[in-house]
Amino acid sequence: MKGLDCGTGNFVAVDENGMRLQRNAFLTIDKTTTTTRQLNLLKVPYVEINNRLHIIGKKAYEYAQVFGNKELSRPMSQGLLNPTEQDAFPVLREIILGLVGKAEKEKERIVYCVPGKPIDKVQEVNYHEDVLKQIIDSLGYEARAINEAIALGLAGLQTAGLTGISISMGAGMCNLAIMYAGMSTLEFSVAKSGDWIDENVARDCGISSAKAQYIKEAGDYTIAPTSDVERTREQQAVKTYYEAMVRYLLSNIANQFASTSMPNFPDAVPIIIGGGSSMVNGFIDVFKDQFQQKQFPLEISEIKLVDEPLTAVARGCYVEAQLEEN
């Protein structure tokens, strides 16, 4: 059995042998005898389609940093399959195959995550869910989907009796679930997250989105509001758009709560946050600062990052796979 986080920015697989991660991205180059030979020699993963080579995963990200005029392509956009990328399906299949391989036994279970339906745009998740299931099933597995934020809650709310609010901040979407004793009472997503930050930083600072992402993830600075450490122009832009994103998320949460019948929790509940976009230094300080400026309809006991935020959703998928197996 395995858990698989199918994120816009990263795919993460978890099983009894540990965790494996791959960037959900590709870089397209023209095919020549020399480039094909070099990629094979260096064991760089790629897919050949229509006489073009798609370099896959982490290597694509690294190549994009070296060749500044090359933009990364994404099989997914805003949490779902990218409708502008005709080669998304074979690229995704190669990424998934590289992480989980082919099933070693018949109908081995894989629980994979899908986003909640976004509340700020008209878009369904059914096609996205079906395509991922088709790819996973084609490798000999039996695939079952779970909501991304619920998966995060299974990993991060265990000490709270699986009760609280889980927020998964990925590259394409922010997903939220309110859980009580392991059951979801409300789940949804908003279509602004890490990629939205990259796009705005890139536009305002005159750099590529790949460069903006690299700066955002570098980890050599903090976006904490109370920090007096000097930031570069690009780092300041990252801070600005993180604050804007959190404000947007909290406003949408408040609006959703106001229009939905809320559960009556007997005690204050925690908010736990995970996902790659939550890993920037000082993020939790930004979230707490913006949270304190809002009227929240539930009493909150604490706000914290889950352990290993990048792999938490995949771990929750694996927990669900284990529960189903038993």
List each language-model region with its residue ranges.
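Nucleotide/phosphate-binding catalytic cleft detector across ATP-hydrolyzing
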Residues: 1-51, 58-167, 181-190, 194, ...
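Gly/Ser-rich catalytic serine loop of serine hydrolases
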Residues: 170-172
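A structural feature that tracks compact, well-ordered secondary-structure segments
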Residues: 175-177
